[in-house]
Structures are given as C-alpha cells and as structure tokens.
C-alpha cells in the first residue's frame, strides 16, 4: 500500500504492508488543526486528503483518491480486493468526493416523518427488523445509470455518519446523529419506501432524498465504536410502530425548523446535553 497526497500522486509519503490478518500498522499522517472541524464558520478544509494505491499478487489493484484524515482521530480504510481477471488489466479507481459539511450538496427535500402504511397492496414488515444488508442506489432515485450496492447495514451507517458529521465532535453529539441516521434508514427499510414506488433498492446516496453514502470511503474509529454500541436502536414516538424518518440539515448553509441541525447538535453536545436531550431539542419531547 503506497500513500501519497491526493493531487501529488508521484510523491509517495509512506509504504506499508499488511500482516497475516490483512491489517497494516497505524500510520501517522498530517492533518489540519482539529479546531477547524469544530468551528462552523471555518472556511478552510478541516481534513487532509490522501491517495492509497493498493496492490497484491493475484488481485486487481485498487486506487482510493481522497481518503480523509482528521486531526487526532483514527481513520480506517477497509478494502476488499477482487481476484485478477485475465480479461481485465485496469485498476479499480475510487474518487472520494468532499465531506457533506465542506462540499456543496443538494439539501434534503422535506417529507412527512411518519409514512402511511395501510394502503392496499403495500408490503410492510409487521415489526421493526434491523436488516443485515441494505441495497444502496448510488445516485438519485430515477438515475437508472447509478449502480446498486449490497452493503452491510452497520457498514452503511458508519459510512454515512463519517460522510455527514466530523468524528472530532463530542461523543454524545455523534450518538444523537447516528440515532437519527439509523432511524431514517430503518424507516426506509420498514416502509419499503422505494420498493413500493417500483424501485429495486432500499435507499439512495442522494442528499436530496436520503443521506450521503460513498463507495469505498474511509470511516473513523470514534464513529465506528458508537455505531457498534447503538446499531439495534432507532427513534419512535408514542403509538407509532415505524421508526421515525428523522430528517436533518447542516444548520449553517441550510436551516431546517423542527429537524436536527448538525452544527447545532455539536454545540449542544459541548454543553453537556445527552443524546436523547439533543434529539428532543430538535424533534420534540415525545421522541
């Protein structure tokens, strides 16, 4: 595995080899000051970007461009390599776009947070089940050129949370955001929202419709640990069986009354609010 700054591929900074279990040692890389990711008015990019070139005998090479490194935070880059196919020689290249708090993405189109589920002919689960896998459509719903990916539910949540918030934020802020992401996702699963519209996927990667998921992006350890702790949970209201479609926005470029705001949840976490207190602050006391 060779590591270089994204945009300067010829300058290899580190070369590492995986051990018998397929893991590398921890590599220290430069990143901007941690404060940049804690200040919503900071215009500078709060993470550095690296390109990883991964090669193994008998497997197709993979290049990941734009792996994000935040200060004082362990980043984890999971890679699954495919065995070499003699008919194909080119390497797989994944370009990781900007983090949603830094880049420009379309804001969420508002929806009802509780879906009608008594219409005829709908397939709806009788109880809330945490799925093992979900199918992610990597584009907007009607983009038939976008690829569908089978993703483990836990890995999906870790990817979305790593794309939507910064892992440097307070742990209870991360918990509140992870709960909102999981509840939103489980609402899509429980109501079979897209399948009932004739699509063959669970959720999309478009921020206008759902939340950001990025193929092969790195995740961050503080987020990963919290998802492992909470992954069977979701948010509900009294006398409502389905998980609530907990919508949110960044709260800086986009404002969204009655939804969680990501930057606002960070300051509540800094003030000592618990995860459920953060969520009730935005979604109301019966959450």
Ranges and model annotations:
Residues 8-38:
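Short, acidic Ser/Thr/Gly-rich low-complexity loop/linker segments typical of extracellular
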Residues 3-5:
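Conserved aromatic beta-strand anchor motif in extracellular beta-sandwich/beta-rich domains
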Residues 1, 14-15, 51-52:
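Generic short beta-strand
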Residues 11, 19, 47, 72-74:
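Short, solvent-exposed coil/turn segments
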